[in-house]
Amino acid sequence: MPQSTQDNTQETRFKPRQIIDGLRRIKMVVEYDGAAFHGWQIQTNPPVPTIEAAILEAFEQITATKPKDLVAAGRTDRGVHATHMTCHLDTFAPIALNKIQTGLNRFLPDTIAVREVEEVDQNFHARYSCVGRKYTYKILNRRNRSPLYHARAEHVPHQLDLAE
């Protein structure tokens, strides 16, 4: 009886495409407050504000071109924040890396910032090269709610039973 084996290494999960001359893969680390956004991924029916759409629009502002791809290590849901979302885009635009970061941060809303930018090999893939994810869930455990934490923590006004 034939046996199948599944190998979850990067090489089997991501098949690099043919290297394209002149194409630049730009890796970015993005931080954002997702309260005003409907998640990472573009949504067109109906169109709503997303992190991906904001980055693409800002990139078009600074290069007058659309990137070939914008890929994130993961996707966040509506209202979710990120401190270190790694993503990459592919472009032929001959713009300096420091101008990409400065330009994106100039045109992005104040709730999104590009923290790091670097040019990487075309075989890097934000999703498949990712080796881990870290999530933080915050609970405000006190009687009264806090206006400072209303969108950043789950308010639990009663005593928590941590024994269960």
State where each predicted segment sits:
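Intrinsic-disorder-associated, low-complexity terminal segments enriched in Asp/Asn/His/Tyr and depleted
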Residues: 7-8
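Structured-RNA-binding interfaces characteristic of tRNA pseudouridine synthases
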Residues: 2, 11-164
